[in-house]
Amino acid sequence: MKKHIDPRHKRRQAAVKQLFAHSFTKQKATDASTRTILKKQSTINKLIGDAAPLWPINQINRIDLSILQLAVYELLSEKEPVKVIIDEAVELAKEFGSEASPAFVNGVLGKIVEEKEIKK
């Protein structure tokens, strides 16, 4: 039986795919939120790097980094509840990442929320 996929989840999947592709080809993003993420990439990557000091940005798996970039952008925009953003990011990590990706993504986002005192 096929499950209905939430349109917001589909948009997040598309954004992660665009960010991932951009990490290889620097192609232009077609989605407005993805373009905004790319414009704010240095700020977003600094937050990720600070939350994962043992993992320099250039050593983080590119799909995990793409998922984290999307989630951090969403956390900073505060349009969705923190729990929803983290849950969605973990689901994307299960879909696209390695076996260790969900735990890594969850840990990094949890630390960012804690350090930036983002409202839960």
Language model: regions and residue ranges:
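N-terminal interaction/assembly modules
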Residues: 1-95, 99-102, 107-120
